A protein has these predicted regions:
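Alpha-helical, largely C-terminal catalytic domains
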Residues: 1-350
């Protein structure tokens, strides 16, 4: 599967014209530092960590801070920081092994009546959401909240480790849309201090519609090597789709790549003659989101590049060129920005 996978990566990177020029090295480092300190300070209190081990929490924060700074280069730093805290909560939930159903018996009624939720994750997130949503107008705020509900329900389904029944062709996409946070990503690009929702609903809703597919499927594509190599992480979108539809994994991978290219082209061509600021924000996200994946060690792209070179696979030179371009702008050692560690900040807060 390595050669078809490399072909898919090159197709995607070539079609989007990957060239990330959003930051100078110093700007990237300074933004990482700022967002790291704000995010870590939030999770000093035990109630915010929801029982997550401190070492694991440190890894979550560093992962999300990189994602935020790389993917949202046009976002004001205060918005970036509050969004970083929000996304860290989503990682905590995704990692949680606690069964959800017991604390969800009254969720809907409590939501309608404005009563406190019983699930500890919702208690913590509801404390933070007003701080995040104050940065957005009513349309984007509703979209972010609705996407949060979908994400929670998607994680609820995933607790059952259910890959989908064979012949249920729509199930893999249904689940992926629920837990992909694509609508949240699309809406979060447009804080009210930079964009007047009332003037840009058509453009914003179009970005949300296309970003849902693009963001989650880029993540699926760039995660595929890591997930395929990890025996504990075999169930991924590519294999789930192949399982449910009966197609080959190679066909599923090709279909995924087509989806990324189609939705990416739809965004760039649709916005080409629209407000230049919207186009700039969306393109900045797309370039940075890819840089984040290509440079983050957890996705093991460097290992993939080395394997393609050693095997002299077709496309290895092109993939190496893209990877080196990403590393040139995005390879920032966490020791330059991820300090002091959460453990130390917790002791200082005692």
């Amino acid at each position: 599967m390595m050669e078809p996978y490399v072909t898919s990566l090159i197709r995607m990177l070539s079609q989007m014209g990957y060239t990330d020029v959003s930051y100078s090295s110093k700007e990237r480092e300074l933004n990482l530092r700022h967002v790291y300190l704000k995010t870590t300070a939030h999770f000093v209190q035990p109630s915010t960590r929801l029982g997550t081990d401190v070492k694991r929490m440190q890894a979550f924060i560093q992962t999300i801070v990189r994602m935020m700074v790389y993917s949202y280069p046009k976002l004001p730093l205060d918005v970036m920081s509050d969004l970083s805290i929000y996304y860290t909560y989503t990682v905590i939930l995704d990692d949680c092994k606690q069964r959800t159903a017991d604390t969800m018996q009254t969720f809907t009624v409590d939501l309608i009546h404005g009563s406190e939720q019983r699930h500890p994750w919702w208690q913590a997130v509801n404390q933070h959401l007003p701080s995040l949503l104050k940065h957005y107008g009513p349309f984007c705020s509703m979209t972010i909240f609705r996407s949060t509900l979908d994400f929670f329900q998607g994680c609820w389904i995933e607790e059952h480790e259910f890959q989908g029944f064979k012949n249920s062709h729509n199930y893999p996409e249904f689940l992926r849309r629920m837990d992909g946070l694509g609508h949240c990503v699309g809406a979060s690009l447009f804080p009210k201090q930079d964009f007047d929702e009332s003037k840009h609903i058509p453009e914003i809703s179009t970005v949300i519609a296309e970003m849902e597919q693009w963001e989650m499927h880029v993540n699926d594509l760039l995660s595929f090597y890591k997930e395929s190599s990890d025996s504990s992480d075999q169930a991924n979108f590519v294999t789930n789709y192949a399982h449910c539809t009966g197609c080959s994994v190679e066909h599923s991978l090709s279909r995924l790549t087509d989806s990324v290219i189609t939705s990416g082209n739809a965004m760039t061509t649709t916005l080409a003659d629209k407000d230049g600021r919207i186009k700039e924000v969306v393109e900045g996200f797309m370039q940075g989101f890819v840089t984040r994946h290509l440079t983050d060690p957890r996705y093991r792209i460097q290992e993939l590049v080395q394997q393609t070179q050693n095997s002299r696979l077709s496309g290895q030179e092109e993939l190496t060129t893209f990877w080196k371009a990403a590393m040139e702008v995005g390879d920032v050692d966490h020791k330059l920005w991820a300090f002091p560690p959460l453990q130390e900040m917790m002791h200082g807060n005692e």
